[in-house]
Amino acid sequence: MIGQKNNINTLIKWRCNKSVPRFIIISGDIGSGRLTFAKVIIKMINAKGIIMGNSIAEVRETIENAYTITEPTCYIFRNADDMRTEAKNALLKVVEEPPNNAYFIMTVENIDNMLGTIKSRGTVISMEPYSQKELRSVCDDDFILQYATNIADTKRERAELERTEHCVLDVIAGLKAKSGTKILKATTQLRSKVTETDKIDCILFMLMFKSELLYHPELYTPNSLKYLVKCTQELQRSSINKKASIECMLVSLLDEVKNEDN
């Protein structure tokens, strides 16, 4: 596994002390290697790994199965940010006192999306950021690396980045022209639903937009920062309409530009 030196050292200590937690929560961005890290844990404890669904029915099925297994088994709940409260509550008792051969791993983007009672019963591992040297070991395209923060980012198609860059430049042009119509026309290219795979990823757009905005100081004011920060934070929440959040931010930035001229 690339990077994650401190987390790997933690695993080694667990193994040496024979103290691998029975319930682990792995927190990190999509593409940061959470599932890969979970597989490293499973291999370390020599367990069978099973990826489970997050519905209440599948959680109950997991619990029933956990009490009948006869060999070490690790149940993985991926992207549990969106797991319903009923399902999380159903897990509480079994993760507090796991059956003899059962281990449980949850992966989440934001640990704050977990119930406090769930967090208190688990051991949290936070995925570490990757250095440019680590990312360069799997990708040698400087344009891709410019916008890569994790391993998954290095696997993006160059065409996707170029399309996103064009969208960003269209938005910048709209801000310069002080035209809300041009800005909103450009944002029609952004993905508003997960199923719209042919459209531009909102988080990638935001990353490239903030980078490009630095070259246009006339388009932001000290007051603009709060809108950028707010939108960046909102994009980390799984329940938010990311496209709408970006559009709201851009309208606010446009208002700031217009007010500067008055």
What are these regions (language model features)?
Residues 9-15, 55-74, 81-82, 86-94:
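Conserved alpha-helical scaffold flanking the Walker A/P-loop in AAA+ ATPase domains
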Residues 44-54:
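Conserved catalytic segments around the Walker B and adjacent sensor/switch elements
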Residues 1-46, 100-102, 109-262:
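Charged, glycine-rich active-site and insertion segments that engage polyanionic ligands
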Residues 28, 77-79:
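Short glycine-centered, acidic/aromatic-flanked micro-motifs in structured strand/loop junctions
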